[in-house]
């Protein structure tokens, strides 16, 4: 099946969020199971640098000016680049300038992305014609609208990575974009008097997916729907809304071949984990003690990530003799709070403000518990890394966290299902009780190792997601 992924970023060439990780891994996994997956992306400077060797597929003029469509290969995956320097030759963030002002021509920049996607389903490339156009987030949302306007020449799938960003622009741009005027309708791409590229993707796609089954249900509610819960509920009732879990890229995140850690290990040879733990304690200037549980948190320091919940009950970790290590940056008041906590407990708490890729890998490899107490989390990746590395996730029951971590209740441990720790309510006392359960299990090392083994046996690789998407494509 010929699948075209339409996106505005992909790892490792250009990344601002989790969307890039998905598009950087899913097409290769799809190729591995027999689908012919390719990528369409604007030719930003970072993309050009990563794919310097291309051939011209087509040249044309349309509402966006003069455009050249090019084709190259990156890590074995075919990539179409939309070469329009007047729109895309801007360094840095693909969406806004250095002062965080959205580019005024974003409606045109991402309108062109959707338009080219639809044309690749109509034969713009003589040698390859998309059978499925799989658009990602609002930037690619108009692809589905253009396909609908052109008679549905291909199946259309739209994946929500972040529902909060809705790509809203003035209604006057509709005619310039070449879309039918009657699409500007509540039963169309209109949202509160504006064009919404996100809503276009939702309304006109054959199938809408998001990054976990639980989050797919949550976004049909007022709490998580960002004003689109009515449309999303309708899609759910029509069986046009599904959740497909993100995967983990084993070439980057696997304890047996992780390029960033010194001591590799695997399920039947775990000595390297203890060595990584000692290195981690040294890195954070904490006492090197193998007998205390190490809690790690790698996150943006925001309330959404539940950082404030943790800080209100971090004393539970300290008082029971555990160690807490935090890596991240974000809200200034939370940064001040974590720094204060570390200053008060220099033998128990270590903090690194900022981001450090090698350190994040060492924390996952050397920790015993990875904390993800988010208020909401569409999918989450750090808990998946924790499972793979035998660093038990402690998570709140929401979104993808609920779909990927099984609580260490007595019943689940006995049935060999338990893989971590789960709490329900976004309240400090609920998290405190969960931390107490961690220490209880830690005191029973044999049982701890059993849970750790089950955690490491879980398979959340991209191949699983690729098969799930193949099934969805065939259902359309």
UniProtKB/Swiss-Prot annotation:
Entry annotated with the keyword tRNA-binding: no
Gene3D superfamilies associated with the record = Glycogen Phosphorylase B
Q: What reactions does this protein catalyze?
A: [(1->4)-alpha-D-glucosyl](n) + ADP-alpha-D-glucose = [(1->4)-alpha-D-glucosyl](n+1) + ADP + H(+)
Keywords of this entry: Glycogen biosynthesis, Glycosyltransferase, Transferase
Name the CDD domains for this protein. Answer: GT5_Glycogen_synthase_DULL1-like
Q: Which SUPFAM superfamilies match?
A: UDP-Glycosyltransferase/glycogen phosphorylase (SSF53756)
One GO term (biological process): glycogen biosynthetic process
Q: GO molecular-function annotation terms?
A: alpha-1,4-glucan glucosyltransferase (ADP-glucose donor) activity; alpha-1,4-glucan glucosyltransferase (UDP-glucose donor) activity
A cellular component term, taken from the record's GO annotations = cytosol
Record-linked InterPro entries: Glyco_trans_1 (IPR001296), GS/SS (IPR011835), Starch_synth_cat_dom (IPR013534)
Q: Which residues bind ADP-alpha-D-glucose?
A: 15
Q: Enzyme class, one word?
A: transferase
EC id: 2.4.1.21
Pathway listed for it is: Glycan biosynthesis; glycogen biosynthesis
Protein task: Synthesizes alpha-1,4-glucan chains using ADP-glucose.
As for family, the record states: Belongs to the glycosyltransferase 1 family. Bacterial/plant glycogen synthase subfamily.
Protein's UniProt name: Glycogen synthase
State which gene encodes it.
glgA
């Amino acid at each position: 099946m010929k699948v075209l992924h339409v996106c505005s970023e992909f790892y490792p060439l250009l990344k601002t969020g989790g969307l890039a990780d998905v598009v950087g891994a899913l097409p290769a996994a799809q190729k591995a199971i027999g689908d012919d997956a390719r990528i369409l992306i604007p030719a930003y400077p970072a993309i050009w640098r990563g794919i310097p060797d291309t051939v011209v597929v087509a040249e044309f003029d349309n509402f966006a000016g003069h455009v050249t469509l090019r084709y190259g290969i990156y890590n074995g995956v075919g990539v179409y680049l939309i070469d329009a320097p007047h729109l895309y030759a801007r360094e840095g963030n693909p969406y806004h300038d250095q002062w965080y002002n959205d580019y005024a021509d974003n409606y045109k920049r991402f309108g062109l992305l959707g338009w080219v996607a639809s044309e690749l389903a109509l034969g713009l490339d003589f040698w390859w014609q998309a059978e499925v156009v799989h658009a990602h987030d609002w930037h690619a949302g108009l692809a589905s609208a253009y396909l609908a306007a052109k008679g549905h020449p291909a199946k259309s799938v739209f994946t929500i990575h972040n529902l909060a960003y809705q790509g809203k622009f003035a209604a006057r741009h509709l005619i310039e974009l070449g879309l039918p005027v009657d699409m500007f309708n509540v039963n169309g791409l209109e949202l509160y008097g504006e064009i919404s590229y996100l809503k276009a993707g939702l309304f006109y796609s054959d199938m809408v997916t998001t990054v976990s089954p639980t989050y797919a249900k949550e976004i049909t509610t007022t709490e998580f729907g960002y004003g689109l819960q009515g449309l999303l509920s309708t899609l759910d009732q029509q069986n046009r809304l599904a959740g497909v879990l993100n995967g983990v890229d084993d070439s980057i995140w696997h304890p047996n071949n992780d390029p960033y850690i010194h001591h590799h290990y695997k399920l039947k040879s775990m000595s390297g984990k203890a060595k990584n733990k000692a290195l981690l304690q040294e890195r954070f200037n904490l006492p090197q003690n193998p007998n205390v549980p190490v809690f790690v948190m790698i996150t943006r320091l925001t309330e959404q990530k539940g950082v404030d919940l943790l800080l209100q009950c971090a004393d539970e970790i300290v008082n029971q003799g555990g160690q807490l290590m935090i890596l991240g940056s974000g809200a200034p008041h939370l940064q001040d709070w974590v720094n204060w906590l570390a200053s008060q407990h220099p033998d128990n708490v270590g903090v690194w403000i900022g981001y450090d890729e090698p350190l994040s890998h060492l924390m996952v490899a050397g920790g015993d518990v990875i904390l993800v107490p988010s208020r909401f989390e569409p999918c989450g990746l750090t808990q998946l890394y924790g499972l793979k590395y035998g660093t038990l996730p402690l998570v709140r029951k929401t979104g993808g966290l609920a779909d990927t971590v099984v609580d260490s209740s007595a019943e689940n441990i006995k049935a060999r299902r338990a893989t971590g720790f789960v709490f329900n309510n976004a309240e400090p006392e609920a998290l405190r009780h969960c931390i107490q359960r961690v220490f209880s299990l830690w005191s029973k090392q044999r049982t701890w190792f059993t849970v750790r083994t089950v955690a490491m046996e879980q398979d959340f690789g991209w191949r699983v997601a690729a098969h799930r998407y193949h099934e969805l494509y065939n259902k359309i």
